[in-house]
Regions:
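Carbohydrate transferase catalytic cores enriched for Leloir-type hexosyltransferases
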Residues: 1-136
Length: 136
């Protein structure tokens, strides 16, 4: 099975979501080495954080390739990545930090998303309307 991950937190966050994301990838690749793990991140981030991912033949990092995608990495993560995943014949996408790219379902790519915080549901008054609409 070819499993793709949103790896931005792996390469950009030293604690919290970064630790969780690295733990998931390292644990899965150690326990199920027969699968392929593709880590998609908008930039190389911090080398020290990338090195916390165990070197295994089944794990690889992937970055935006096109000029437009490199100029607008946030847009690539939300919409451009879907075309890449389709071309790569990914079997499953895992959004490790509360979000997944648009149009995965329409492109036949099953997805899992980890939700870390639901406080916006309990205390919506603490959030701006735009943030509430994004989170829900």
């Amino acid at each position: 099975m070819k499993i793709a991950f949103d790896a931005k937190r792996i390469t950009h966050n030293a604690t919290g979501l970064g630790n969780y994301s690295r733990f998931v990838v390292n644990s899965l690749s150690a326990s199920f080495p027969e699968h392929i793990y593709q880590l998609y991140t908008p930039g190389k981030g911090k080398e020290a954080l990338r090195k916390r991912i165990e070197e295994r033949p089944s794990v690889s990092f992937h970055y935006p390739e096109g000029r437009f995608d490199k100029l607008f990495p946030s847009l690539w993560r939300t919409s451009g990545l879907t075309a890449t995943l389709r071309k790569e014949h990914v079997d499953l996408f895992h959004g490790l930090s509360n979000e997944i790219p648009m149009n995965l379902k329409q492109n036949g790519i099953p997805a899992v998303v980890t939700i870390h915080d639901l406080i916006f549901l309990r205390y919506p008054q603490l959030y701006k309307p735009i943030d509430r609409s994004i989170y829900t």
